[in-house]
From Swiss-Prot:
Gene3D superfamilies membership: 3.40.50.2020
Protein name according to UniProt: Adenine phosphoribosyltransferase
Function: Catalyzes a salvage reaction resulting in the formation of AMP, that is energically less costly than de novo synthesis.
Organism lineage: Eukaryota, Metazoa, Chordata, Craniata, Vertebrata
Natural source organism: Cricetulus griseus (Chinese hamster)
Record GO terms (molecular function): adenine binding; adenine phosphoribosyltransferase activity; AMP binding
First-level EC class: transferase
Gene behind the chain: APRT
Subunit structure, as described in the record: Homodimer.
Length: 180
């Protein structure tokens, strides 16, 4: 990984204590999105990892609603791939499949269009941040319903203390930046 590019990305992540509730340290990617050089570096670094790990053996990038949409299409473009969207319930037209996941106070659902992928296609799931792993795990379940193969999940930021990586089980996971 190009250390100077990684430093450029890391410098554009800000921390806000006690947001959105007391005791939470929020990692804000807004400065990264505002700076074209940093954003470009984040995409290049993720793409470089995927190329070296999987070569040309990825068919699609799947972006998670909503901030995965910021990275998914750009990453797909960098790799010369298409991007499919995994949305929150009720946001996609046509036939869909869904998977639910737990939130702190209740549950939520993700959906993907039934015709988004063919069985056996190889997919990388991307989001901005991995916390508890609930959303990413639900995305993997959805892709499994379509008989797609999740070859890896990636994110810009990983909050290691929340152990989301463990929830993914045997699915490989990669993040550019790790914080407690």
């Amino acid at each position: 990984m190009a250390e100077s590019e990684l430093q450029l990305v890391a410098q554009r992540i800000r921390s806000f204590p006690d947001f959105p509730i007391p005791g939470v340290l929020f990692r804000d990617i807004s400065p990264l999105l505002k700076d074209p050089a940093s954003f470009r570096a984040s995409i290049r670094l993720l793409a470089s990892h995927l190329k070296s790990t999987h070569g040309g053996k990825i068919d699609y990038i799947a972006g998670l609603d909503s901030r995965g949409f910021l990275f998914g299409p750009s990453l797909a473009q960098e790799l010369g791939l298409g991007c499919v969207l995994i949305r929150k319930r009720g946001k996609l037209p046509g036939p869909t499949v869904s998977a639910s996941y737990a939130l702190e106070y209740g549950k939520a659902e993700l959906e993907i269009q039934k015709d988004a992928l063919e069985p056996g296609q190889k997919v990388v799931v991307v989001d901005d941040l991995l916390a508890t792993g609930g959303t990413m795990c639900a995305a993997c379940e959805l892709l499994g319903q379509l008989q797609a193969e999740v070859v890896e999940c990636v994110s810009l930021v990983e909050l290691t203390s929340l152990k989301g990586r463990e929830k993914l089980g045997s699915v490989p996971f990669f993040s550019l930046l790790q914080y407690e």
